[in-house]
Amino acid sequence: MKRVFIEKLDEWSKKSNRKPLVLSGARQVGKTWLLKEFGRLHYAQTAYVNFDRNEPLKALFKGSFDITRILTGLQAESGVRISAKDTLIIFDEIQQCGDALTALKYWCEDYPEYHIACAGSLIGLALQEGTGYPVGKTHSMTLYPMSFGEFLCAIGEEALLDVVQSGDAALVNAFAEKLKPLLKTYYLVGGMPAAVQAYATTLSLASAREVQEDILSDYNRDFAKHAPKIQVPRIRAIWKSLPVQLAKEDKRFIAGDVPTESGGKSRSRDLKDPFEWLEDAGLAYRVWNVTKPAIPLEGYRGRIFKLFGLDVGLLAAQSHLSPRAVMEGNRLFTEFKGALTEQYVQQELRASAGAVPHFWTSSDSRTEIDFLVEGADQVVPIEAKAEENLQAKSLKAYRERFNPRFAVRTAMTGLRVDDGLVNLPLFALPSFARVIQTDREDCRA
């Protein structure tokens, strides 16, 4: 497996004002593997400890934040002689020990020379429970499922990723017929590392689906294990509703479409806490509308949102989508009103471009832009479609009204730039970060 996130970890490790790192993300996105692999590649040794069901380790942080004393205990627990210069210290499942989270303040203030990297799947939930998180004393990052580019590397197609990232339209278009079926495969396999590994090893979509179903079962058990009892039925109802909501023509989330335990309709205020729980667990993301497409987008956040899942492959599994039935032609890209395509696009925007997408709808609801992201100094509108014959009427209306320097339309047609409109093939989304760094005159995917 190759995760480009390792490059971000390398940047963190070299900072002169480095703070302890807290890496969050949903369960099973590969946080532990990533930190261990980073330690293997960039440090002489790694001291790894896991707080899950480890009472002696938790006791080490009780009652005293004497870092010298804690270091002695960490060496005994990990079996590694820790050196500030060349040892990566990994605290796994740190949300299981609130005192260890609090202690990060003292590592930051008094022992900044040590390289501390923490991983936790439910850190957001731990904070809800009143853990003394050291605000301003850590560096936070979020790990998402493997992107399409990382998937290409995992199945031995790294050369095709180089093509996609070249920015050469003629070169990218020349390999379109090789990239399209691989993108179809990614829609079904997704980016959960275990599912990717299963497919890369067997080339079997069925093997990947078995892994996905196990992951979904694990998440369902997590609801009962970690969520407040009163919220569990509502969390499960939202989770079950997610594929149905995305399969609608209008993908805005409607609370009334989520059934209550008694079979009635849910109310928005009753779902507020369950939504936050799913987001804190990294299992779902709300993409909010904005009342005005201007920077900062979050400053113009409205009250309407679309709810997306963690991973396109998991969404396909939740939807019980038969791989055999949809691999022919381009049906997969448009199935369920393009639900998988929009899931893929927003997922890629987060994972590859580090963007936080929003969307915009005109006051008369006639024009909707699927996604807006912040570029270097402008809001970039994105129309996320899969059809090959696109009119992009909403994008045209948006451009006429707001005159952005450039806009992006995803499609299955070739890569090209025409008067500030970037036609970006869905399989070229791994290069999107380059798009938002440029002006329309020299815009290159």
Language model: regions and residue ranges:
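Interdomain motor-coupling "hinge/lid" segment immediately C-terminal to the ATP-binding subdomain
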Residues: 128-248
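Pre-Walker A adenine-sensing motif
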Residues: 1-16
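Structural recognition of the conserved hydrophobic beta-strand(s) that form the central parallel beta-sheet
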Residues: 90, 115-121, 142
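Conserved catalytic cores of phosphodiester-cleaving nucleases, focusing on short active-site segments
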Residues: 345, 349, 369-388, 407
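Accessory nucleic acid-recognition modules appended to NTPase machines
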Residues: 200-368, 372-373
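Hydrophobic positions on the alpha1 helix immediately C-terminal to the Walker A/P-loop
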Residues: 34, 38
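Conserved lysine of the Walker
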Residues: 31
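Short glycine-rich substrate-engagement loop in P-loop NTPases that contacts/grips substrate
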Residues: 54-84
